[in-house]
């Protein structure tokens, strides 16, 4: 049943979005419905902008941007809904791989000036740092889902950092253990 759901979700963006995000606690069921719709459109046009994924429908595009700008929408609630679906799917597998890594998302357009430092002192690259834990089924390497993700902006002056970035790895491991509970004994961490 779970394997069928994963396979189906890979082929139908709307099914995937509904299975991953329909339990998001956004304070109003209309927001959750909008999240599912926006996620489905973006998944259907993977790697494309909201404008392109809206396929010429201005109402869909404006709805997506209003959703993103809504102060009542919590990125943490969205991430948590996805992680909880990952935990639910993980129950079907006897052995899992938790792939953990940090990467950067580099931006060059106008808004990039407000983002964090990515490179060395003289480097002008700006963007986000993202630390993720991706859960895979161990024998087929099929993606189960995203178990944890945290993103932050690095300050221009390293002395202004709130914490050492190595702490992101420890926090990810602790969150993974908390979410997986007794299933953690089935998980092989790959860092």
Q: Which residues does each predicted region cover?
A:
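Conserved, well-structured functional cores that handle cations and Mg-NTP chemistry
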Residues: 2-191
């Amino acid at each position: 049943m779970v394997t069928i759901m994963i396979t189906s979700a890979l082929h139908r963006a709307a099914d995937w979005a509904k299975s991953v995000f329909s339990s998001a606690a956004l304070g109003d069921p209309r927001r959750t419905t909008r999240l599912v719709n926006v996620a489905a459109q973006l998944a259907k046009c993977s790697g494309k902008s909201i404008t392109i994924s809206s396929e010429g429908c201005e109402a869909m595009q404006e709805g997506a941007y209003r959703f993103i700008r809504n102060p009542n929408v919590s990125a943490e609630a969205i991430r948590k809904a996805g992680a909880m679906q990952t935990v639910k799917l993980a129950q079907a597998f006897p052995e899992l791989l938790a792939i953990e890594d940090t990467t950067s998302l580099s931006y060059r357009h106008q808004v990039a000036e407000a983002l964090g430092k990515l490179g060395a002192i003289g480097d002008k690259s700006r963007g986000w740092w993202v630390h993720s834990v991706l859960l895979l089924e161990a024998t087929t390497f099929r993606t189960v889902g995203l178990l944890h993700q945290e993103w932050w902006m690095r300050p221009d002056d390293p002395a202004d950092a709130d914490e050492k970035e190595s702490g992101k790895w420890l926090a990810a491991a602790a969150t993974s253990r908390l979410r997986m509970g007794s299933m953690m004994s089935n998980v092989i961490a790959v860092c």
